[in-house]
Amino acid sequence: YESLTIAAPGAEETLWNIEGTINVSLALTPGLQSGHQVRVYFDGEPQLVNSTSFTINEVYRGVHNIQAEVLDETGKLMIRSRPNRFYVQQTTVRGIR
């Protein structure tokens, strides 16, 4: 692989009112090869996915970090992205007195 970057969410991006779900998009050149998997670290917790576009649920307000790497069919690390830090904000409506 030549390059792997996290296209979305962007580095230092602030996401508003996401209702607990983020869409993640990776830019991988060349594309994901048959039998290879993506391991994503979201706030340090790993999960395996079979695509360069996916969603992560139960994402709450605060600062978050995401990083991705591609593994071959034997689990060997092929390439790793730089980590991205992003922020989730929630609009708060104050009560009327």
Roles of regions detected by a PLM:
Residues 69-73:
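Beta-strand-rich extracellular modules
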Residues 38-40:
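Short beta-strand elements bearing conserved aromatic residues within extracellular beta-rich modules
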Residues 44-51:
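Short beta-strand segments within Ig-like beta-sandwich modules, predominantly Fibronectin type-III
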Residues 10-12, 23-29:
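Short edge beta-strand/loop segments characteristic of extracellular beta-sandwich folds
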Residues 76-87:
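Edge beta-strands of extracellular beta-sandwich domains
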Residues 1-17, 89, 93-97:
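Short, compositionally biased P/S/T/A/G/V-rich stretches that sit at domain boundaries
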Residues 56-63:
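Surface-exposed, short loops/turns at beta-strand junctions within beta-sandwich domains
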